[in-house]
Structures are given as C-alpha cells and as structure tokens.
Amino acid sequence: MPPRDAVPTSTQVSGIGADGVQTEKVLKNRPKASALRQQKLPAWQPILTATTVIPTVFVIGAIFLPIGVFLFIASDAVSEFTVEYTNCLSPCQLQINLPNAFDGDVFLYYNLENYYQNHRRYVKSRNDQQYLGDLTNVKDCAPFDIDPATKKPIAPCGAIANSIFNDTFTLAHRADTGIVTMVPVTTQGVIWNVDKDRKFKNPPLNDGNLCDAFNNTTKPPNWSKNPCEVGGFENVDFIVWMRTAALPYFKKLWRIVDRTTNPLFSNGLPQGTYILTVENNYPVQSFGGKKEFVISTTSWAGGKNSFLGIAYLVVGSLAIVLGVVFIVIHMKFGHSMNELSNVSEIHH
Amino acid sequence: MPTEARDNNRHIHLGKVRDPHHQHAQRFCSNRISTCKYNGFSFLPRFLYEQFRRYNNIFFLAIALLQQIPDVSPTGRYTTAVPFLIILSVSALKEIFEDVKRRRSDNKVNAFSVEILVDGHWIEKQWKDVSVGDFIRIDNDSLFPADLLLLASSEQQGMAYIETSNLDGETNLKIKQALDITSTMTSPEKLSQFESEITCEPPSRHVNEFNGNIEINGVARHFGIDQLLLRGARLKNTAWIFGAVIYTGHDSKLLMNSKRAPLKSGTIDVQTNYRIIFLFFVLVALALISATGSEIWRGNNIPQAWYLSFLEHDPKGSFLWGVLTFFILYNNLIPISLQVTLEVVRFFQAIYINNDIEMYDVNSDSCAIARTSNLNEELGQVKFIMSDKTGTLTRNVMKFKRLSIGSRNYGNNEDDEFADASLIEDYRQGDEHSTSILEVLKMMAVCHTVVPENKDGQLIYQSSSPDEAALVRGAASQSVSFHTRQPQKVICNVFGEDETIEILDVIDFTSDRKRMSVIVRDGAGGDIKLYTKGADTVIFERLEHGKEQEEAVEYCTEHLEDYASFGYRTLCFSMRHLTEQEYSQWAPEYKKAILAIDNRAKLLADAAEKLERNMILVGATAIEDKLQEWVPETIQALMAADIRVWMLTGDKRETAINIAHSCALCHTNTELLIVDKTTYEETYQKLEQFVARAIELEKQEKGFAMVIDGKSLLHALTGEARKHFGDLALRCHAVVCCRMSPMQKAEVVEMVRKLAKHVVLAIGDGANDVAMIQAANVGVGISGEEGLQAASASDYAIPRFHFLRRLLLVHGAWNHDRSVKVILYSFYKNICLYIIELWFAMFSAWSGQTIFERWTIGMFNVIFTAWPPVVLGLFDHPVPAEQIMKYPALYASFQNRAFSIGNFSLWIGLAIVHSLSLFFLTYATMEHQVVWDNGLTGGWLMLGNCAYTFVVATVCFKALLECDSWTWPVVVACIGSIGLWIVFVIVYSLVFPHIGGIGADMAGMAAIMMSSYTFWLALLFIPLATLLWDLVIKSLFTIAMPTPRELAVMYNKRTTSFNGFERLASYSSNVLENMRLLTSSLRGSTTGSTRSRTASEASLALAEQTRYGFAFSQDESSAVAQTELIRNVDSTREKPTGR
C-alpha cells in the first residue's frame, strides 16, 4: 500500500520531460537560462594586486613622459611679450623690444585683470536674438534694455555690450635705421566662425544703409559712437567682447599681424624695437584693474603655457617612481608573509 | 430570534427561502479579494502622496519652484523641473508595473474554481462568485474559499478533517463536526430542500471564537467554532463536505487577520536619508558661506567696478536673495537621481531573483519571486533568521524508519522508509524474539486512533496525527496490516491472515501522560493485553523490575540515542498481559472515571496509572519527520555566514529539539539551555543563570543553543527579564522556540529587532507565519506547494527552503554590495561635479555664476552619468556566486563593507579631492585661454565644457575602478556615457539659433573645444591624474591588507596557491578572523558529518536533557475525543458520494 502523501518525485518530472510539447506547457515558469538573466556574463575581475598595478603604473609613466616632452617643447617654442599700460596716459606710446623674431602668425591681445566679466548678472545681461538682427528683442538686457529718455530699445542691449572695451592700439616697427613701419594688422580670423555665421547678424538693410536699420534704436549709454557707424552687430571688436571670459584675468584677441601686405612682416614680427601707441580710454583704475598688451605666437598646442607639459612630466615620473616603490613593497611583503606563516606553523 | 433592527449581527437566509432576487437585509462584501495599491482614480493622488513623503522629493519640488523666481536662479527656470519630472515618471511606471503584477496574482486566487449549488446541481464557478448564503461543495485537499458553516460531510456524523497550518501553524489535523440536524443532508437533492435562517456575530479577527444560531423549522440550534471552516484551511482525509457560506472575501477571518503589508524600508534607505539630511545642512552652510562671500565682494567692488554699477541698488542683491541663489546653485549636491536609480536597480535586481534558474523548483514549476524590490540589499545584511518549522524546515511527511526490538536494531538511515528484510526473517525463527516482533507490529497496527479507508482498492489511513499514520503504514509494510475499524474491534491482516482484535478500552493521550494505551482482547487467544506507547521516560519508569527489563532498557537506550542523533522522533512500546480478573476489577473504575464530571482528567489519569505498570518493554520506533531538501546543509551554511538561526514552532519542545538536531541547528554536543519555567521569578533566575553559563561556554568555545517555550517566553519578554533574555539571545547562534502562537512569533521577531539594530529575516510558509513575516525586516515565504498565504504576505517568496542560501549569500550579498556602491557613487559623482561650482564661485565674484552650461548641469544625473550607477547596481559581482556559496563566511565579511559613516566620509572626501583636482588642473591648463594654434580664446564655456568633460570622464572611469567585475555592459555604459556627453555637446552646439533662443551660449562650442589638441591631451591627463591616487591607494590596501573578498578573488584566479592564500590571510588579524570562518566553513563542508561521535560522549553531554522527541502530534482538545472517535467509526460502512 503506497503512502499517499508522497511528494512528487523526480521520475514524474523527467517522465513529463520526455514529452517535448508537454514539457513546455508544464514547466512554463522555468526561467530562461540566458547569461544576462543568470548574471553569468563573461567577466573580468580587476584586482589591484602587484601583478596588475605595477605594469599599469609603468605604462602610464611610459605614455605620459613623451607627451610631456612634446608639450613642453611646443610651449617653449612659443614667443610671448606682455606690456602693461594701465596707467599710461592717453595717447601713450610704449617702446617694446622683441629680443627675438616672432615667426609665423603673430597675435595681438589685450589683457584685463581683476575684471569680472563672469559675474552672473553681467553675463546674463544680453540678448542673442537681438544680436541676430531682431532689434526690438531686449529681454534679459535690463537695465540696458530700453533707453529711459527716448523709450527706444538699446542696440546692442545689455550690460556686456554697454561696457565694451574701447582702447585702440597701433603697433609700429622701428628699424635700427630709424625707419618706422606700421605693422599691418587684420581682423581676419579674430573671431570664431560660429560667431560670424550664427550669432551676430545685422538687421536687414532694406535698401538703406546700416544706420537706417538701426534707426529706431538708441546706442548703449557708454558708447561714444553709434553702433551702425562701426559695423553694427558684425563689428569684430564687439563680437570678441561679447564672448565673455571665464575668469577675472582674461585675454582677448585684438588683431592678427597681416603677413601679406608688407614683406617685412611676411614671416611674422622680426626681432627689434616696436612702438605701441595706445588710445587709453577704458577705465580700470577705479576697481583696481590692470590692462596689458600682448604679442604672441602659437604652437599646435596654443599659446605659451607650459603647465600641461610639466604636469605630464611630473605625473609620468611619479608613476615610474611608484612602480618602483610597488616592486619594493611587493618583495618586502612577500618576504614578511613567509615569516608570518612560519610563525604560525611553529604554533601549530 | 433577535430582532433585526437593533443588533449588528449577521443574518443569513439559507436554502429555498433565499430568493435569487431577494437581497439580504445587510450588504455582504464579495468574495473577490484585492491587494492592489492603486486603482485608476486613486493612482495620481496616492502616488504623489507616496512620493512627497520622501524628503528629497519635497526638496526638489521646492528647488523647482524657487527657480521660477526671476533673477534668482543661476541655472534657469526648468533645469530642475524637467529632470525631476523625468524621474517621477520613471517611478510612476515602476509603481504601475508592480501594481499590475499584484492584480494578476489576486486574479489568480479569485479565479480558483469551486462548486456551488444552483437549482439542485453543483455548478463549477470561481471563488470570486461565492456569496454569503451559498451552499458549496469542497472536495478533499481543496482550500475553503470563504468561511463556511459545515453542514454535512462524506464521513460518519458529518465529521471532517481539516488542516489549518495556513492559519495557526498547527500541523496536526483538526476534526470538525457538523450539527446532527444538518449532517444527514448528504446529497444535493436533500440540500436543495433545506431552508434555514442563520444569525451569527459580525466579522471579527478572532480565529478561536465563533458563535451563531441556526434556525430550522422554527427550532434554533447553537453552533460554534467546531462547525466553522475558515478560508485558507484545507480539507483533508475527507472525500467532500457541504458548507454554507457565512463570511466572504475581506470579511473572512483570514483576511481580517492579514494586515495590509506594512511599507518596509531597508536600513540602507534610512541611512541614506540621514546622509541626505546631512548633505542638506552642508548645502545650507555652503549657501550661507557663499552669500557672505558675495556680500563682502560687493562691499569691496561695487560701485567701483563701474561695469557692474547697475547692481548697486539691485533689490535682488540682498544677502537673503544671495542665499537663495546659492541654495539653488548647489542643490545638486543632493543627488536628484539617487532614488530613481536605486529603484531601477532594485527593480532589475528583483528580476534577477525572479529569473534565477538555481532558485527554480522543477517539481512545483515555480521560481523565486521578489514581491518587493526595496529590500534587496537587506538580504545581504541578515543577522537573524527566524524560521517556521512545519512546511518550512520539514515537509510534514512522517516516515517510519527504524525499529528497535530487544538487542536488535532494524532498519537503516539511508532508505526512504523502513526496509529491513531481516525483521521478517527473525520473525520466522519462531523464538522468543519473534514474539516480540509480532507484538510490536501488532501494537503499531492497533494502538492508535487511525481510521482506515478503502478507496479504489487502496488502503488509506486517516489520522489527525501524521506520526500514527506513519506507524500504521509501517506495520502494514511489514505484513501486519490494519484494514478495518469497527466501533468495538479492529481487523488486521497479520502475515496473511485476518485477525480480529477487540478494543476493550482506550486511555487517551494527553501531554501530561505522554503516553497512550489500549486494552485489547486478542482475537486468537482471547488474552487481554495492555498496549502502551509513549515517551521513553514515562515508559521506562513503568516497567517491571528485574534484570531482564534493565537489560532491555539498556539496549533500547542505546538505540534511542542512535535514532535521536539523526533527529528521529522516537516512541517506546510496552505491553502487559492482564488477567480477566485484573481487568474486570479495573474496568468499572475506569468507566466511572470516564463518566465523572468533576475532576475527570485526574480520575482518568489515576485509573490509568493503576494499570500502566509492571509492563515489559517490547520495542521502540523511530519516525523521521522528513525535512525539506538540503535543510541541514542550508542551515549550516547560514550559520557559517554568522547568521543566528531561530526556529519558531508551535510544536512541543521534544519535537522541536528533535528537528533542531536533524536540521543541524544544534549538534549532539551542543549544550541546550532549556528555559521551561512557568513563573516570572523562575524564568528570570533561569535566564540569569544561563547568561553566565553562556559566557562560560563561549570561553570554552563550546556550542550552545537556547530552547524556550511559549509560556516562559511570555515572562522572558516582560520587565527585567527582557534584558537577560536579549543578552542570551544575542549570544546564542541557535535558538529553538517551541509552543509558540502565531502572535508570539511576531513578538519575538519584533523583540529581536529591537535588541540590536540587526536585520531579522523571517521565513515561513503558512498563514500563521504572516504576522512574523510582516514584523521582520525581511519576510520570506515558501511558495512551493500551495503558496498563497505566507507567500503573498512576504517580501520574497521562494519555492524551497534551501534556496534561502542562494537568496542570501548570492543575491543578498551582491545586492547589498551593489546598492551601497550605487548610493555612495551617486553621492560621489554629484559632489564631484557640483562642488566645482564652489571653487568657481571664488573666481566669479561670488555671483552665483555657473561654470557649466545650465542644461548640461541639469542633465548630468539624468543622461551623462545615469548609466554607470545603474550598471554598477546590476552587473557588478563582488565575488563569484560559486565561491560565496562555498565559503559562506564571505557573507559576513561583506556586511562589514557596509554603508558606514566612515565609508561615506571617505567617498565624500574623495569627491572633494577629485573636484579640487579636476577644477584646478583644468584651470591651470586653460588659464592662458589660448589653446589653439589660431590664437583665439574660447571664453566662459570653453573652461566649463572642458571641466565638465573631464568630470564626466573621471566619474565614469571611477565607476569602472570601483566595479569588481567588468562585463561588457559595464564597460559599454561607462565608456558610452562619456561618448554620450560628446554627442550631446556636438548636437547641442548646433541648435542655436534654430530652436528659439535655446543654446546661444553653447553655439559652436563643440567644434571650438574639439579643435584643440590641448583639450584632448588634457582629457587623457586630467582624469587619469585624478584617479591615479585612487588606484595607488587601492592597490596598496590590496597588497598590504587584502579584504576577504580580494583574497577570495585572488584565490579564485589562482594567482596564489592555497598555501599562499592562507599565508596572505594571516597577515592581518581582522582578515584572519574572517579567514577562520571561511576555512572552517570550507572544512565543515568537506568533512560534513559531525554526527560521528560515540554514544557515551553524547549521553554525558545530554545527561539531563530531554532529547528524543516522542512521536505524538495528537490534537488533544478537538471537537471529537479520541475514544469517541474510535468508538464511532465503522470503516466498513458505505460512504455517501455527495452527488
């Protein structure tokens, strides 16, 4: 007499399993045995033992050191000359001696220090729609949106536009013979293509001139000239200024030396004496600011900044040192662990 | 009848008077049950209510609202609202999905079929269609769909056996009996003629109380709990019953008792909340500091800085506005996506659990089910397991295994059931020993309350005690087969010949007597014999004096010890020949005692005592309470994982201890600290004494376990004793609680939860475990055979007990490790990015200007770094599954990798260091601004976008570095996230001016940034240089002080030999401790048997302890007394079919 409380045995199940159709029906809840569901994807377990970390560190060192060297060489090849003119009375003339020739493209910058172009409310006070030609769109430009006197919209509106940098520079080369040659400069390549193509457009002219198009607007209070007289929104100096800087010590490209017009400068700026004439309009003394004029060449890595190259070299060397340290530790620990195990064996 | 107007009693019309169109005066609820959280209308309000109960959601809502104030938000108006909405909708999707699942499982229960009487015929309908007043028919082994009044059954006098283990956890069958006036209605014809009115109490939770009246033809009869069949119980050993439905659906006692599952939140969630609150205060502090900085800067620079002089009289320039601005700026320090990332991760972790083929049971075709997903990581923190016994550890299947007669020990442990041909061979010898064999087999076949039933030519034994049935079956398998019971006699087939044995008297089993006797007149010889079976202690002291019996006891004890070491339940059998005179003197006295009203129990016991003496020991039996598969292995593994295992059972102490031995909860040399006192003072003293003893045993490194019964527990949980009990409970690695009521189980769980902040897991299978499962941090239900009650109240349902090992060791340890990583990593990445705003504030006049573009800030958590934490949470395997299954000690070591304040601070510190490194390295690289050979400068976003790129790269590589196992999804997600940002930047750069004014700042920035070689070299350098220190520190720790996980992985990778493995381990004492556990569990699993020990050792250790459970699971106070039951049964009578 068989016990009636028998639990299902495996034979019953395998009996069902023999019948293919029924198996599917009966075992409908059986989970799929895919690697993903069963958490059985092929995996590599990174474990930072001496055997993995030592090669890693050495590889890092081996990659970093040459990159560091290249970067350092690149930065070293860049010539840069800076002259401060903050307190120079306008129109001021500064003599510059370039100790060596500045070969290739030569870029002329102005530097501003302690100038917070990245102040939140300042950055915000602009309207990119207006700069695309929609003159009446002055949203967000407060308090430089509508001129309180004329009730006309200010164009270009906003605090950034209002505070545009208005110093001008002329650079002249003085040969040993005493002949002074103006260094020809160009605005070609001073702004990013995107600014020219997508961000700054004058309003449609409608058969008139630019000033007709700007007719129903007022110039920003700080501006001395009407914007239409200096190229409207497509004014290069304006566009450069509107690309606000990230840090309170910033550099803006003013002009590039034109190497096509005068053969003297076809290879850049030759070594020698230069005279910089500055029309010093822009007030910075009140807030302790500083103004500089910069002449610089570039390398593939940009201007003169050896930081990244040195950093690569330092970290690369450190990695090599660490690798050595790891080897020492590894050997030392292996040794001490042997001893420890001997001790425990004695105790047993 | 009481008047209907006043009382709130339930009035039910039964039968013909119940017009289908005539409604009951009261409205009764339907039998459809629903455990859903939402319906179409309640979804939105309830969902929002649930969501905004969380602090962080309120926080982000506040931020989103604050951003609407003009000129205050540094990041625009919608940069919090949009990601927040995305995140809320992901949560909503998850909630809807889970509710649909609940609805499906409800529908399954609601759609169970049941037969309802309609127009004199049984019509098959669904459970949900059952309504109050219906007549229904339930067949054997079916569940009752509602609370029913038992009207009639297939058995004599309307008796029915039911199994209530789902309700109260008691394993023995209960006997219910229909009222005599209804028990005759055994056909649908009779039933459809039946009409009556029922008045009964309103629905209540009391399972053991019930009162009602049934009025038939104007005569009212009282009925009570003996006639009530509860929903959730199961009909057993009874072909069918007819019942009238009294309480349906949510009115039924089962559902009245089931609370709505409490919303459990894991310890990690609680800790995370604290961390978030901490960060909130950091945020407020930073906002205050920054606003102060802003004030100072303004004081020094405005109006001198003429380009900003328009801010001089700015109403939004005050300190408080500044605080608000910075509050919004830094709000992302609190990870907005953490909640949803965790939810998504847990959701998929739950899917892993549901899909684990190694937790799939072929027999029941069911898998593990994670019913809630927010406790996944809690499974990895379990310190206490509270396990139900019946149905969870044991199958509640009894098998007759061994037989001891004289010096011979029959049977073996290997076979499923008793199988020993030598028994019959010895019987055939025809000597004195063979008489003993015959007597034992006869006693097994006669001395019981089992009722045989012939069904389709097979004998089926019906019994309220599964042990007795096992013995009768055992005798039958040895050719002494009991097949007919009539009121005064039983007929057995003894070695091929029917033998009629007259039952003269039955002396019932009680828990005091611990024995049961029958007095029989042997059909063949006409001898009167007393057959007594019972616990060894009570039998041994009632034996004849003399050398012969002493010797028999000696043999028997030896055998019993052997049986006990395997956890078998044992019973001793003794007998005595009575003379006619002796019996006729005793019988009237006993009759008188039976009829006595006062002091009946004592009179009966006294009378029995007079007869039950000078007996001779004939043998002893061993019954195996079949364990579920792999129970001892599982328990050993769990204990090796440093989890304390408690067994909570309604059973008697002896039975409980027995099972504790067989399931490896304690071993033969484990000292049992038994608390069995009835008064508070005694319990207190005992506990105090045991605490001292436990400390002593701990010093001696000896195993010990506590055994406590329900009554003592009541005292132990009150007042001063509680402290001692808690102390003892924390010291014991194994605890057995016996004679527990379901509520007590829950109380114990709660008490242990309160003792220390440990995670308590409760596991059970029946409705009686529901309270405990709900009270525990994590509730696990066994869903195997029926899987309705416990499983549906549980957080995790598994088809087999032994899957608990995998659920905890693999899924628990993994998920905990993963979730902790997800949380810490989420904090890390947010702080790493957003604290950069603070560094930048120093360079931006404390104006609140962001260094990054506003939408890139908002999308950081939602897009660019959303995937690394998700893949960490889903694909990281800290240690291979096979390994942690093999070395459960690893589980304990993982608990130490917990979400501690130290660990949290480490990550936060790291985040700050990383952000400093990232910002200042970027600053130094970009300070000169000209990073192209075209000599141009990039402006504000050149710095911001570069820094952002480096942060994204660093954060994604950090995820890889933290990941313990690299699978392709991990690598793809981490590298892909960086790619995603690059793609985003390219696309975003192209937007302006095509879609409104969006993206003006970003216009062309991608081309500008990516045309710089310096940028690419910095991208290689800055993240690597930032992470190099992590790498170095991590490897130093791995080399010098490897964690057990690392050792295990190294071991697995065979980078070291096993010797080296141990040597490595011996380096740090902490690791050593873990290794001891690890290797001990290793050895434990290889040597396996701790049962091999000598008998003398065991008897020494267990001198005063009762170890052998005696096999009685008899229902003592049932509707029908044992004697009465026997006297009323005639197995030869034809049963009605009920059709």
From Swiss-Prot, chain A:
Compartments where located: Cell membrane; Early endosome membrane; Recycling endosome membrane; Endoplasmic reticulum
Mutant lacking the gene: phenotype: RNAi-mediated knockdown results in the appearance of abnormal vacuoles in the intestines and defective recycling of endocytic cargo with the accumulation of cargo within abnormal early endosomes.
One Pfam family cited in the UniProt record for this chain: CDC50
GO cellular component: early endosome membrane; endoplasmic reticulum; Golgi apparatus; plasma membrane; recycling endosome membrane
UniProt keyword annotation of Transmembrane helix present: yes
Sequence intervals crossing the membrane: 53-73, 309-329
Alphabetical keyword list: Cell membrane, Endoplasmic reticulum, Endosome, Membrane, Transmembrane, Transmembrane helix
Stored PANTHER family: CDC50, ISOFORM A (PTHR10926:SF0), CELL CYCLE CONTROL PROTEIN 50 (PTHR10926)
Protein name: CDC50 family protein chat-1
Protein's organism: Caenorhabditis elegans
UniProtKB/Swiss-Prot annotation, chain B:
Localization annotation: Cell membrane; Early endosome membrane; Recycling endosome membrane
InterPro entries in UniProt: ATPase_P-typ_cyto_dom_N, ATPase_P-typ_P_site, ATPase_P-typ_TM_dom_sf, ATPase_P-typ_transduc_dom_A_sf, HAD-like_sf, HAD_sf, P-type_ATPase_IV, P-type_ATPase_N
Active site: 388
Keywords: ATP-binding, Cell membrane, Endosome, Magnesium, Membrane, Metal-binding, Nucleotide-binding, Translocase, Transmembrane, Transmembrane helix
One Pfam family this sequence matches: PhoLip_ATPase_C
GO biological process entries: endocytosis; lysosome organization; negative regulation of phagocytosis, engulfment; phospholipid translocation; phospholipid transport; positive regulation of phagocytosis, engulfment
Organism: Caenorhabditis elegans
Protein name: Phospholipid-transporting ATPase tat-1
Family as reported in the entry's similarity comment: Belongs to the cation transport ATPase (P-type) (TC 3.A.3) family. Type IV subfamily.
Observed phenotype of the null mutant: Results in abnormal formation of intestinal vacuoles.
Enzyme class, spelled out: translocase
Gene field: tat-1
Biological function: Transports phosphatidylserine from the outer to the inner leaflet of the plasma membrane, thereby maintaining the enrichment of this phospholipid in the inner leaflet. Ectopic exposure of phosphatidylserine on the cell surface may result in removal of living cells by neighboring phagocytes. Regulation of the phosphatidylserine distribution in plasma membranes is likely to help in the maintenance and control of the membrane surface charge.
Keyword Iron tagged: no
